[in-house]
């Protein structure tokens, strides 16, 4: 399995999850089973937790209505009435899922939430599956980078104005890299600690600049 897309939309309204079963012959009998979302408040090692933010069972979704292919990126598709869900079907049934979850409905902040997205599969890969490729669960982590991106633009304007790199810019990059390294190495508890310490209170604030010529 792999994520085709895992991000928060630019308008901060939606958590977008697009996932597929790998397109190799040895995964012919493997289907997507469920998507479970934890946050920094519910995360546990070897998750998902017993009280996740959100659970989505793929099989249950196949009572949904159909829509025209041009209404969604999938081809062909079927979606729920509110067009939050998009699926392929037929020979690829339950091998591709796209969710666009309204973050307001999830009752969490788009700026201060670290999402842990688990995708589970069902079915058995063939016996010739390479070692390490037969996992039945993957985990993706996502935060809202839009506020950080906007703050970066402000800092870059300061660089243009003063020809000096602001200390706040360096500080922000180091903090973000610390979280990224923790996630990449699987040290999620430490990533959560850094997220809560460095970003959770400030990520929703409007960016500021000390550059007088840009205001």
Swiss-Prot record:
Q: Tell me the protein's name.
A: Tail hub protein A
Q: What species was this sequence derived from?
A: Bacteroides phage crAss001 (Bacteroides phage PhiCrAss001)
Query: What job does the chain carry out?
Result: Forms the tail hub together with tail hub protein B (THB).
Q: Name where it mostly resides.
A: virion
Superkingdom, taxonomy of origin: Viruses
| Quaternary structure annotation from Swiss-Prot or TrEMBL | Heterotrimer with THB. The heterotrimers further assemble as 12 docking hubs that anchor the trimeric tail fibers.
An annotated GO cellular component of this protein is: virus tail
What subcellular locations does the record give? Virion
**Which regions form coiled coils?**
none
Q: Which UniProt keywords apply?
A: Viral tail protein, Virion
